[in-house]
Amino acid sequence: MGIVVIGDVFIDIKGYSLSPYIPQVRNAGTVIQIHGGVARNVAENIANIELKPTFISAVDDNAMGDDVIQKLKRHKVETKYMKKVKDGMGTWLAVFDHEGDVVASISKRPDHKPIEQILDEHGDEIFKDADSIAIEIDTDKEIVKKTFMYAEKYHKEVYALVSNMTIAVERRDFIRRTACFVCNQQEAGILFSEDYDHMTPAELAAILPDRIRFAKISRMVVTMGGDGAVFVDSDGHTGIYPGRKIDIVDTTGAGDAFFSGVCIGLTYGKTLQEACGIGTRLAATVICTTENICPRFMPEEFGLTR
């Protein structure tokens, strides 16, 4: 069944200013609408490495929802468990400045009950043959609880990322049960109630081993934008994976792509450092385009065997 990805579908509406963005005035630019959502992006990224994931989610019961499912199918994502319901998808509206950074955004979350129903109806068959599980740790709490229940029943590793750290920080008990938790520098500071914003990778690498050991987190990766990522496990092994020098067009989806690479690498036998290398490469391909997913690769390009 491959990697099982659990989470939301969003429709992303993105506006790009052609000159320095000025709030409260009309800024000339372009507006595009694309399929998004953290979990949807992760599922499509994994599929674009020809690894055929299964996606557990919901879409709107309309033509837009049909379009989302058909695109996922074309990319070889297994969609048979997805539900079509009212308010099945969320919406994310974002404005970018001329340098590709988000300057304003609003989001509407979808109804999560359909995903919970999918797990109730098909949980055993979904989890028993999964290679691993990828989930947004800040999704509905009942979904997270059921995910870990089934994952532990069938001895599957769970890899987690976050889109809202203020919710995720209340899920520390679940984060402890993950095989690896991936977040950014600011989110790591929230998790450990500290300020990491001005730390260098070396400074962060020096303190993270104690932080995750005391918190009983098995493995953690903290992304630091252009400075790369710091990775650490509970045995005290730590390292820094450098970032790539690229021209930034749009940073949307870069974190999702990085997480996808880490999840792929760890699921299919790579070390934490090697998995960060896959994530860094995928993130770089997203940042230099307006797309929020990576292009298609063959698994052999990353030393993966199917």
Where are these regions (language model features)?
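Conserved phosphate-binding/catalytic region of the ribokinase-like
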Residues: 3, 27, 198-306
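Ribokinase/PfkB-type carbohydrate-kinase core domain
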Residues: 1-9, 71-84, 96-238, 298
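Short, basic and Ser/Thr-rich N-terminal targeting/leader segments
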Residues: 49, 87-90, 225
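A general structural signal for well-ordered alpha-helical segments in protein cores
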Residues: 39-43, 65, 90, 144, ...
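Glycine-rich phosphate/adenosyl-contacting loop at the front of the ribokinase-like
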Residues: 1-58, 63-74, 92
